[in-house]
């Protein structure tokens, strides 16, 4: 993993822009199960554009966006100079934190802050069918989501389908919780019983295993 260099002593890593998100996940998991990073789950997505767009990940509710956790960059400007945070203006570094891929120059590497993850992490995907049921679940979640603990990541994918002469919609609810299955069931039973989550729907393991489950790899 020559595109990802981890320093556990400082809880930091240097990521070359050529690295994919999958390589970041893999490189980190080979060194530690105690730390992760708030990035997306597309394993083939390039980290350079991902970081420069700001981007949101499974740990973002607790730790912020990807670039909220970038501490330094190696950046080539319009004059061909290779700059780091110390040698560029601070407003340029600020602009690089989510200002858009390629807008301010070329980022060749970024120094990131690793963030703590729990020893056990639970993920689940639960599908529901039916316009009425899904409408009620989504309406309910709008009231719950802002108050949910930051350890809980959630997203839902809604798509239409046709089976025979019947056209309907299906919603897939994806969640990741920094905790055990028992803790996840207790939380969801308290704040979102309408989802009817059961232990059979959950997969508990290390953080990287939860990421792989949600990414479906």
What residues fall within each predicted segment?
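FAD-binding glycine-rich core of flavoenzymes that anchor FAD
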Residues: 1-95, 104, 133-151
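C-terminal cap/substrate-recognition region of VAO/PCMH-type FAD-linked oxidoreductases
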Residues: 73-217
